[in-house]
Every structure is written in structure tokens, then in C-alpha cells.
Amino acid sequence: MIVIGRSIVHPYITNEYEPFAAEKQQILSIMAGNQEIYSFRTSDELSFDLNLRVNIITSALELFQSGFQFRTFQQSFCNPQYWKRTSLGGFELLPNIPPSIAIQDIFKNGKLYGTECATAMIIIFYKALLSLYEKETFNRLFANLLLYTWDYDQDLKLITKTGGDLVPGDLVYFKNPQVNPATIEWQGENTIYLGNFFFYGHGVGVKTKEEIIYALNERRVPYAFISAFLTDTITRIDSRLMSYHASPSTPQTSIGFIPIRDDAIVATVGNTTTVY
């Protein structure tokens, strides 16, 4: 269900020739048909969320095709022209290097980088926002970047919730409870849901849910009897907060609305929204 202000609406793309129009319409249809409530104050916020999701998906595919390597933190490496490898295996932005250039280099020269899956997901989030922000804004927000697992910049606002409906552009986690300790890095897989039943995970590539579970199951202890599984934990960029920094020059998606109800009372507690 999609709510704009106090109105429950069914949105649709009005310009079928705009970039990724079909993908955007699919996302809107999924959100409108889900039981979960997606609440926005304005249509511009919905447009930002929609474009953010598309950019997360395209950034995930770009990273997949970049040659970016899968490595444990003990074996991680980065381009020393832009980053310093920390003692824990993270990547620390060098002084006087704009974060926008350093993030773009990961996608341009992926073979010069290697790390594990959680860091890869955060890199994808930064790249998606870079596509929607002025470079000056991005550099101001994310100065002194450190890329290391979930230690992301305080100005990157994320929402993690349990339960809810899966939407393309969501980050979801596969858990492998009986992983072989010799390959503990396969205790789970962070992935971006690409839509059409496909996920991207750094290390497994672009695969279906069943294929990712199979890959994780291959890395269990001998005689394991518990299968890997897709958890119900979903992580998203808080598009309502992050939309404040969007570039005025970023093209807006033209969205029309079929009104369903215009007197909804919306209440949000934590990350749960209810409509009365």
C-alpha cells in the first residue's frame, strides 16, 4: 500500500519512454499491492525512493561486472591511490581525496579491490546516492569515508526491520546456520533483491534464492541437517531523510495517481507504519 500524505493511492508511470520506465512501474505495482505500508509526505519523496531503488539495482549490477573481488577482511585489498587499507581490513579514504571519485573508482577499477559482502552492499548504497546527489553534496556528507562491514557514515541513514514485503532494491540476508568453521565467511550472504526472483550477492553473483541457498549449503559442516535460508530482515536506505539532499537537477519521475482513499490517518512507531 502506498500513502502520499493522507491519501492511499495507486501510482503509475505517465511517461513510458523515460529511462527504466518498465522497471519503475513494476516497483510501484509491487509496493501498491503489498500489505506493507509505504508512506511518503509528497510525490517527490516517492519519486526519489523509486529512482533510488533503480540506482541500487543498477549499481549492484555494475559492481558485479566491475571485477570486484571477494576476499575476507584478512585478505582484503584496495587501490592505494584513493584508499588506505586498515589493520582490520577496511578501506579508509585518503586525505584530500573526494569520496565521490574514490567510490567511482571501485566501479571503474574493480579488480584493484577485494572485500566481503557486507562492505560491498554499503558501497552499492553510496554509489546509488551519488547518482542522485550533486558531487559537492555527496563529498560534504560522506567526507572521511571508512568502508568496513556495517561501520558506515553517520550521514547514511538506513532502516533495518524484521518482516515486511520484499521490493526490488531491498537488501536482504541469507543465513547459513551450520556453516563450516573453516570457511566462516560463508555464514551468510548479504544481497540486493534485483526483482524477477533474482538477487545479487558479492561472492555468489546474480542468482535466484534457490541457487544462493544451494551455494551456502555446499559450505556447511559435514553431515549438516539445517539448510541455509532467506531471513525476514530487510535493510533499506531511509529515502525520506536522504531525499533532503537530492540534487535539484536530478530528473523527477513523472508519476500519476489513481486515488483510493483520501482520509487516511497514518501512524508510525519505529519502523512500523499503520493506517487507520
UniProtKB/Swiss-Prot annotation:
InterPro entries in the record = Gln_gamma-glutamylTfrase_bac
EC annotation? Answer: 2.3.2.13
Q: Which GO terms describe its molecular function?
A: protein-glutamine gamma-glutamyltransferase activity
Q: Which residues form a coiled coil?
A: none
Which keywords annotate this record? Acyltransferase, Sporulation, Transferase
- Pfam families named among the record's database cross-references: TGL
GO biological process terms held by the UniProt record: sporulation resulting in formation of a cellular spore
Protein's UniProt keywords contain Acyltransferase: yes
The record's section on NCBIfam families has: PRK03187.1
Q: Which family does it belong to?
A: Belongs to the bacillus TGase family.
Summarizing the function annotation, the protein's role is: Probably plays a role in the assembly of the spore coat proteins by catalyzing epsilon-(gamma-glutamyl)lysine cross-links.
* Protein name (record): Protein-glutamine gamma-glutamyltransferase
- Species source reads Bacillus anthracis
This protein's gene is called tgl
